[in-house]
Amino acid sequence: MKIISNTAFGGERPLFELHDLRMENVVIRAGESAIKECSNIEAVDCRFEGNYPFWHVHGFVIDRCFFDVGGRSALWYSDHLKMTDTRIDAPKMFREMHDIEIENVEINDANEVFWRCKNLNIKNLKLHGGTYPFMFSSDRSEEHTSELQS
């Protein structure tokens, strides 16, 4: 597995179609589709500021990361995600995905999250505000999920 650490990327698709990659302390700046059409990706202690960073990604781990407001619509059309200890300030996360594990995650703009998702295993998720979470989703297992008004 290739390791990229302590750097930043911006612009359009800087990590397009990469496989078997671990990112440590990486910042994804403004731009679109930074990590598109990838597989076997790990992001640890990373920050996502640009739109659509994880689209069409198959098999990935996101641990101790932060999704800034600009990182909207970050996780779409992907599968086999394990996300832990992460804070999300961006809206419209998790769309048309399956096989998702979430643990110790806080979503501060829960507008339109988890739409058309299948096979979700959720532990300790906090949703703040937003409308229509889990629209058209199925096969959901939850432990300690709270929806808080902002």
Where are the model-predicted features located?
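Short glycine/acidic-rich loop motifs that flank beta-strands on beta-rich extracellular proteins
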Residues: G11-F16, A30-K36, G50-H58, G70-Y77, ...
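Extended aliphatic helical segments
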Residues: V26-V27, V44, V57, V61, ...
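Conserved small/polar residues in nucleotide/adenosyl-binding loops
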Residues: E143-Q149
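N-terminal segments that cap or nucleate solenoid repeat domains
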Residues: M1-F48
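All-beta strand scaffolds that present successive hydrophobic residues in beta-strands
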Residues: K2-I4, L21-E24, I41-A43, F60-R64, ...
